[in-house]
Amino acid sequence: FHFASPASPIDYLKIPIQTLKVGSLGIHNCLGLAKAKNARVLIASTSEVYGDPTVHPQTEDYWGNVNPIGLRACYDEGKRAAETLFRDYHKQNNVKIKIVRIFNTYGPKMHPNDGRVVSNFI
């Protein structure tokens, strides 16, 4: 499983380079290990890969509308790059993959001023 990435806008806006590296280099390392060990791997992606959708509701094959140089691009594009690497490792190396796009999570250790939609509503 690969769930590593800052998800709070407050956090990832402070460390954009590290956030993007998790989505690219971290994923590359994870997939390389899965290939070497013939392991299955699942990544937790995000609804942010859709960006600001121009289509409602979005279908599974919707490509998204992400601003590649916007404030949140380090997170959005990192997740998009991660999904691309997953697909490419599957196609090129037959690594067994699963991609899940998780929307609006909340948990007991989430900071109340996290900056995500659920904590903002609460």
Spans of model-derived segments:
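N-terminal Rossmann-like NAD(P)+-binding domain of SDR-like oxidoreductases, especially those catalyzing
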Residues: 1-108
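Substrate-binding strand-loop-helix patch
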Residues: 22, 108-119
